Amino acid sequence: MSRRHSAEKREIIPDPKYGDVVLTKFMNSVMYEGKKSVAESIVYGAFDIIESRARANPIEVFRAALDNVAPAIEVRSRRVGGATYQVPVEVRHERRQALAIRWLIQAARSRNDRTMVERLSAELLDAANNRGAAVKKREDTHRMAEANRAFSHYRW
């Protein structure tokens, strides 16, 4: 990490359909090889499926899914006197959001539905209802932090 300058945060333009900055970040994470139009069609297609299946506002389902997947606490390795401890630390807001987005997309990609649109919509609906692989990942992270609570005094 550079000691001189911290990188400037880039301004992210809200998506054209819903006007949401977090949704743009999500689309950018879905995107492969700079193909943003493909990523947009995947996300908007998944939102159309959510709207028809759940009869709910897809943005609200998306936000609920992100909230249910975002971890509050995680473990970080800390070396103390030759031993490495897994120290539980709180997760800052930006990292919470980034992890939630990353885990949702990984979980969607590992599903067995036919298209990415179907996989993403199914994972978002599951996450909004506190089910699915992404929510399990968050619970595993919390369980790991709880198991290592004894080392919380090593926080930095």
Curated annotation (Swiss-Prot):
Signal peptide extent: none
Keyword RNA-binding belongs to the record: yes
GO cellular component, one term: small ribosomal subunit
Gene Ontology molecular functions: rRNA binding; structural constituent of ribosome; tRNA binding
Keywords for this protein: Ribonucleoprotein, Ribosomal protein, RNA-binding, rRNA-binding, tRNA-binding
GO annotation, biological process: translation
InterPro entries, per database record: Ribosomal_uS7, Ribosomal_uS7_bac/org-type, Ribosomal_uS7_CS, Ribosomal_uS7_dom, Ribosomal_uS7_dom_sf
Domain of life: Bacteria
PROSITE patterns referenced in this protein's UniProt entry, alphabetically: RIBOSOMAL_S7
Record has NADP as a keyword: no
NCBIfam families: rpsG_bact (TIGR01029)
Family to which this protein belongs: Belongs to the universal ribosomal protein uS7 family.
Subunit annotation: Part of the 30S ribosomal subunit. Contacts proteins S9 and S11.
Function: One of the primary rRNA binding proteins, it binds directly to 16S rRNA where it nucleates assembly of the head domain of the 30S subunit. Is located at the subunit interface close to the decoding center, probably blocks exit of the E-site tRNA.
Protein's name according to its UniProt entry: Small ribosomal subunit protein uS7
Gene name linked to the record: rpsG
